[in-house]
Design a protein with these regions (language model features):
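Surface-exposed beta-loop interaction hotspot
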Residues: 129-174
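Vicinal oxygen chelate
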Residues: 9-21, 53-64, 77-105, 124-129, ...
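Short beta->alpha transition motifs characteristic of CBS
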Residues: 119, 138-145, 220-222, 289-295
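Hydrophobic, ordered structural segments
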Residues: 74, 90-102, 108-145
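Generic structural signal for well-ordered beta-strand positions
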Residues: 114, 136, 189, 262, ...
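Core segments of cupin and vicinal oxygen chelate
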Residues: 4-9, 15-65, 108, 116-120, ...
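Short, charged/polar, Gly/Pro-enriched secondary-structure boundary elements
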Residues: 63-66, 76, 133-136, 207-216, ...
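C-terminal functional regions that serve as terminal interaction/effector modules
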Residues: 209-214, 219, 239-256, 260, ...
């Protein structure tokens, strides 16, 4: 069996379930984002059911993106999740150099199957739960030409906005930090903790502090809105993470674009970073906007 370090994992995108993607992409576009790809119909339809409707967007940073996916979905497990949870952050997708070996490795190390390994026309892939139940999709590009397009590193707007990753609320932060290091080959960028709260920044093998500052933040439920969501849904993908050179300006731009205020910029007492929280349009999920941390 291959080791995690041999599977070349990189964090690729977050999938958001939403039934009005054409309308709800506009606040993102007004907030300095751009579309990297739109897949629909036969372009990316790999099953005999449902349909594909995928809008990929990003801003400022290299590689990391979001994908708005609309029903009716191609897979039964997707329709079941939509039935149970509705609008939400469904899964984080990772790219690997060997999807078949990746699934064997993950299932042997605490993950549980959601969608079995399948070979599709342009990629091989599968979906699993991590040990706390959050969805992980893993894909391996197999077509010579097909690949979701990427932005170069170019912080956007006068505020210097970059989408850099996701936060996840965990039931056991330490156990999940250990799991993502050992099983998904992540490494710790920074750790912030007191007697109550723990926040750990992790990244993948391709991290570059200037041009590819992709992060996965693992933490306990700290804010009231996180505690409420955790109580209803359990451990979950809690926020899209942005960094900006000018947080206040980026926050004002977000409000103008149509995002909703959850918390105006203030210094996070744990990390020491100026941080704001907003709700985005695809069901009111959370956006975390912070100044750049330098662990």
């Amino acid at each position: 069996m291959k080791r995690a370090s041999e599977l070349n994992y990189t964090i690729h995108h977050l999938c958001i379930y939403d039934d009005q993607p054409r309308e709800n992409m506009w606040p993102y576009l007004r907030w300095h984002h751009g579309i990297t790809n739109y897949f629909s119909g036969a372009v990316f339809h790999v099953t005999g059911e449902g349909h594909s409707d995928y809008t990929f967007l990003g801003v400022g940073g290299h590689a990391y993106q979001i994908q708005i996916e609309a029903p009716p979905f191609q897979f039964e497990y997707e329709r079941n999740w939509w039935r149970d949870h509705g609008h939400g952050y469904n899964h984080i997708c990772w790219v690997t150099s060997n999807a078949r070996a990746s699934m064997d490795h993950l299932l042997a190390n605490g993950a549980t199957e959601v969608m079995p390994f399948e070979e599709f026309p342009t990629y091989d892939g599968f979906v699993v739960h991590d040990p706390e139940g959050r969805w992980i999709e893993v894909m391996e590009y197999t077509d010579e030409y097909f690949k979701v397009q990427e932005f170069t590193h170019a912080p956007a707007g006068e505020c210097g906005l970059e989408m850099i990753g996701n936060a996840e609320v965990c039931a056991d932060v330490e156990a999940m930090v250990e799991w993502y290091q050992e099983v998904m080959d992540l490494r710790i960028l920074g750790r912030y903790e007191n007697v109550v709260d723990t926040v750990v920044y992790l990244t993948d093998k391709d991290h570059d502090p200037e041009t590819r500052n992709t992060v996965l933040i693992l933490q306990n439920a700290r804010q009231d809105f996180e505690k409420n969501h955790m109580a209803e849904h359990g451990p979950y993908i809690s926020a899209i993470v942005y960094q900006a050179r000018h947080v206040q300006r980026a926050f004002e731009d977000a409000l103008w674009a149509g995002m909703k205020e959850l918390q105006a910029p203030q210094v996070d007492p744990l990390t020491g970073a100026l941080t704001a929280y907003l709700r985005e349009p695809c069901g009111g999920n959370v956006l975390m906007l912070t100044e750049r941390l330098k662990p």
